[in-house]
Amino acid sequence: MWNGRYNTHDYIYGTEPTDFLREHAANIPAGGTVLCLAEGEGRNAVYLAQQGYRVTAVDSSDVGLAKATALASARGVHINCLHADLAEFALGEEAWHGIVSIFCHLPSAVRQPLYAALGRALTPGGVFLLESYTPAQLAFSTGGPKDVDMLVDAATLRRELTGLQFSLL
């Protein structure tokens, strides 16, 4: 699905990071290692690399990752790209100063084990940044998944992000 969507000359979500990431990236320890989940065409990963982070972008679309690599090159930075399915991806232990999930909507069967591994994957003082649609998005005819199982609200986050201290913004 995503290879077909990204298979265009244009960057379907643009080449600039989300406003949320611009506002909150500085919460990640400076110069640290950052993992971007379901990064697609790379706009957020490239921004983080431009801020001095060592960035790994993981996505199931090799087409998206090729565009991410091209964008990084055009901006004079490097990102490490990993082609992987998040259902099978191991986050590692104390491997990341930051994990970024920008509109990475996953079915609960994939999301729950991934979220359960976040606390172990972050270094002490590490930060998880999440920007996501909530079930309220279904009332609108704009973007996002149409399957409520792929959307999260505050109660879902409190239940699934066990072992993490977090703030809802």
Language-model regions: role of each:
Residues 1-29, 136:
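Conserved class I S-adenosyl-L-methionine
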Residues 125-133:
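Conserved beta-strand signature within the Rossmann-like core of class I S-adenosyl-L-methionine
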